[in-house]
């Protein structure tokens, strides 16, 4: 297809370059002993998730719907963060998340034990002098 024939708006992905970059990130994971996660808020082109998931450990989601997308399309860990969690969302997140980061001690007190009982690791976001 000629470039002029591509409908707009369109995203054109160089899969070779994407895989090359993923290999670099995999090497970082191995050498640093850490996990590299795909930030879905910045990149949610799920058609490329099968390729990316070969190299990265999982995803980060900024809420329930991104977490659902991750669980459905990206074989790996699902990490979730949100400024606040609704009760109904938390019930679903308990079924699909591997790690949840809370934005306040209050949220951690409210949901932390329930998460741990469901086998989900938890974290607390700290912003010294800000929150």
Residue ranges and their predicted role:
Residues 21-31, 69:
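A short, N-terminal amphipathic alpha-helix
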